[in-house]
């Protein structure tokens, strides 16, 4: 049986973000990289922007270092910041595990906040948060 790897991190991110109480109370919808046209705000979209395999020589082990971007869109600046704070809190609250239907799993531990950019367009305030995470297959 094939194991699942950090290529499946989006499945775990969906579970984490969609299941967060604070984000749900704010009415935030969660999407993978593609958001449906005309989706009403607030929403967040997540994506894996980089993945590097890391060998741990001392333990003869391997893990993946994954860079994750989460983009927050909201109509009001204060709402965008509040959602971004909730995202940061939930992302730094791990470790998290995703189990597929066959019992295979990945674990996302040690998640670090790497930075954030903000922007605006005609109808939205935007925050792009970046995290790096250590992901292992189980």
Region annotations inferred by a language model:
Residues 1-60, 82, 94-104:
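Small/polar-rich, solvent-exposed N-terminal microdomains that initiate assembly or binding
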Residues 1-5, 75, 119:
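A general boundary/transition motif marking the beginning of the first structured unit of a protein
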Residues 42, 66, 109:
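Short beta-strand or tight-loop elements
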Residues 89-138:
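Acidic-leaning, charged glycine-interspersed low-complexity segments
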Residues 61-78, 87, 125-135:
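Oligomerization/assembly interface segments of phage tail-like spikes and tubes
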Residues 53-55, 75, 137-138:
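Short, cysteine-centered beta-strand-loop-beta hairpins and adjacent loop/turn segments enriched
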Residues 57-62, 120-122:
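Short, solvent-exposed beta-strand/turn "edge" segments of beta-rich domains on protein surfaces
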Residues 83-89:
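Short amphipathic alpha-helices in soluble, non-transmembrane regions
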């Amino acid at each position: 049986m094939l194991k699942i790897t950090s290529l499946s991190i989006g499945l775990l991110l969906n579970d984490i973000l969609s299941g967060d109480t604070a984000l749900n109370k704010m009415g935030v919808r969660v999407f993978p990289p593609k958001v449906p046209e005309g989706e009403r705000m607030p929403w967040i979209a997540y994506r894996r922007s980089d993945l590097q395999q890391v060998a741990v020589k001392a333990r003869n082990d391997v893990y993946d270092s994954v860079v994750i971007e989460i983009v927050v869109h909201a109509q009001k600046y204060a709402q965008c910041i509040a959602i971004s704070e909730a995202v940061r809190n939930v992302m730094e609250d791990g470790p998290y595990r995703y189990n597929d239907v066959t019992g295979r799993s990945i674990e996302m531990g040690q998640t670090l906040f790497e930075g954030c950019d903000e922007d605006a367009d005609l109808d939205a305030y935007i925050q792009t948060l970046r995290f790096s995470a250590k992901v292992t297959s189980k």
